[in-house]
Amino acid sequence: MAVLALHAVFGIFIYFSSVKGSSQPQARVFLTFNELQETKTSEYHRISHSPLDYRILLMDEDQDRIYVGSKDHILSLNINNISQDPLSIFWPASANKVEECKMAGKDPTHGCGNFVRVIQSYNRTHLYVCGSGAFSPVCVYVNRGRRSEEQIFKIDSKCESGKGRCSFNPNVNTVSVMINEELFSGMYIDFMGTDAAIFRSLTKRNAVRTDQHNSKWLSEPIFVDAHVIPDGTDPNDAKIYFFFKERLTDNSGSTKQIHSMIARICPNDTGGQRSLVNKWTTFLKARLVCSVMDEDGTETYFDELEDVFLLETDNPRTTLVYGIFTTSSSIFKGSAVCVYHLSDIQTVFNGPFAHKEGPNHQLIPYQGRIPYPRPGTCPGGAFTPNMRTTKEFPDDVVTFIRNHPLMYNPIYPIHKRPLIIRIGTDYKYTKIAVDRVNAADGRCHVLFLGTDQGTVQKVVVLPTNFSASGELILEELEVFQSNSPITTMKISSKKQQLYVSSEEGVTQVPLHRCRIYGTACADCCLARDPYCAWDGNSCSRFYPTGKRRSRRQDVRHGNPLTQCRGFNLKAYRNAAETVQYGVKNNTTFLECTPKSPQASIKWLLQKDNDRRKEVKLSERIIATEQGLLIRSVQDSDRGLYHCIATENNFKQTLAKINFKVLDTEMVAYMTDKWSPWTWASSVRALQFHPKDFVGAFSHSEMQMINQYCKDSRQQGQRREEPQKMRGDYSKLKALINSRKSRNRRNQLPAS
């Protein structure tokens, strides 16, 4: 197994190197939590300094509220500003249940509380809310009022049992959707956490669930998300899709593998008449694959589904399903984003069923007769208009579903490869939200990716018909003070806001902060943020309906040469010359930090008005991310250094450093005295005076020497009484005279 795992790791590294390059991409801008607060573009809300495990469970853009569940609290926050007018309900578990929970050996802090895990809109005035209830789930109706201005938020009913609606264990995911005042949940239905089910409750009809203790249906699932998706024009054909991962035993029966899955059911399923009574008769599932293919055809999987986001369109069949996947390997840490066409998912569910056959129980396509109506078809829909309920399904249809719930073909992503891969990083992706943005040169998708380190990456994905490569990390935001993992994330394209939660609180950030990219047109253009454009004065929000003549944006190429003419581009590409000194045989550092980590740096050296030549790097001359380190400085190192940054084929000079080398002997004499200028009195005893130094060193050079002497004496040297200058005075005089003669040769002749 270890050999196979290592082979998988090498396969991913080979794939990643060939497709994306060897280095991991970096964000153009990184903002810490404090820096984000200083921009005054974010809001943060919490009700306690203690972590309360916040989860954003419902966003209602019609009432301008987002609803958050946490330990013992239900929160209603203003969608425009979560810090303004927050409403909360304190809803703890009963004291008896908390005590029973502790006596059962459950965690008093992270288990024996009422962790709110279900908030669904029941009708226009009420929410239906469920919590873990200290391992005894409970549910209530909450009155939120008809309009948000009413500021109504209160529990409006007695507690009722939440069994079959919310998991007992708050650390086990519960997913749910509400349709016509009926609740559909994916959770564990028992105290011990052994009976997983997809359950319909809160219904005037009979309750329905998955077949109990049938590993063909569910095998130790961890539920991730649930969505209602139309299937054609007939509303009776709509399906509820449940996304989860489960542990499956391999054919040998000895090893359990994790597979990511999609299951679907018909909301109007009422179970079978004689078989599968009060069980789903339309339950089907298929494997969801996110993998990379090695050169030898070996497939390596990102097998653990973490989150799902549906990017809807006017046509439901063109809906895109984005998924976050991570590796289950203990050898390395990796995550990926895969994207699926809904039409491809539906094609798999309309394809062959899986069937186990032979002594090794290998999966093969089912070759027998498929009963009518096709298993998985909803009653009363386009294909079964005369069947009002699943109880009218023939027995062979129900029996087939019980024994063949799995589809043979897996569901592959677009192009059969991940959109984004991260390996060898100190983080994993945990959550995803996606926005569709109209830029000046086309439509693109912007991904907001939450990590287990409490940050959010903003990534733009360029369409494949663009000449540029697929992804760019525009920003990385530290949305929480601690490194607590992102637990939920909601996006509002209407409000242009992103809402993020972790165990410590909820943060709201806008989808764009255009001014952080810089104050020049080139900075704005190089950022390639589809939300932003240069308006002639600053980098600001881009509106596709505005006048394009005055808006400069180039997401496709990010080329300032074509977009920023007339905006002081020549001055921007140059840098003012500075002077820096180094001492022979010592180490010096020429500082040059690029504005973007996505830029590459090249150092050029120009000597005595000669042509610029690229600096040859060696063990003595080392390029770092912050500049150029020169060890054991030599006379040959003097000259004019140019630090050139290249980003997206756009070159600019970040620094011009006129590097001058001081003679070691001269500095040694000068650093011998306590006062930086007392050496002059000793020099007066010779045949020359301090004025002789005017020709040897310029005013700036003397200032540099003075500072160097001061710094040298502060490095732990013991203070000494002034004494006569030691050393060979004749050697010092010869050194100064030679320096004066060199300077005279470089001076212009008198006119």
UniProtKB/Swiss-Prot annotation:
UniProt-listed SMART domains: IG, PSI, Sema
Region (Disordered): 712-751
A Pfam family of this chain: Sema
Signal peptide as annotated in the record: 1-21
Residue span(s) of domain Ig-like C2-type: 571-655
Domain (Sema) ranges: 28-511
GO MF annotations in UniProt: chemorepellent activity; neuropilin binding; semaphorin receptor binding
GO biological process, one term: neural crest cell migration
Glycosylated residues (UniProt): N81, N123, N268, N465, N585, N586
Tissue: Collapsin-1, -2, -3, and -5 bind to overlapping but distinct axon tracts.
Cystine pairs: C101-C112, C130-C139, C266-C378, C290-C338, C514-C532, C643-C709
PROSITE patterns with a match to the protein in the record: IG_LIKE (PS50835), SEMA (PS51004)
SUPFAM superfamilies in the record: Immunoglobulin, Plexin repeat, Sema domain
Subcellular localization, as worded in the UniProt entry: Secreted
Domain of life of the organism encoding this protein: Eukaryota
Keywords, in A-Z order: Developmental protein, Differentiation, Disulfide bond, Glycoprotein, Immunoglobulin domain, Neurogenesis, Secreted, Signal
CDD domains in UniProt: Ig_Sema3 (cd05871), Sema_3C (cd11251)
A GO term from the CC aspect: plasma membrane
Biased composition, class Basic and acidic residues, residue ranges: 712-731
Family, similarity comment: Belongs to the semaphorin family.
Domain notes: Strong binding to neuropilin is mediated by the carboxy third of the protein.
Role according to the record: Induces the collapse and paralysis of neuronal growth cones. Could potentially act as repulsive cues toward specific neuronal populations. Binds to neuropilin.
Name the record gives this protein: Semaphorin-3C
Organism: Gallus gallus (Chicken)
Gene assigned in the entry: SEMA3C
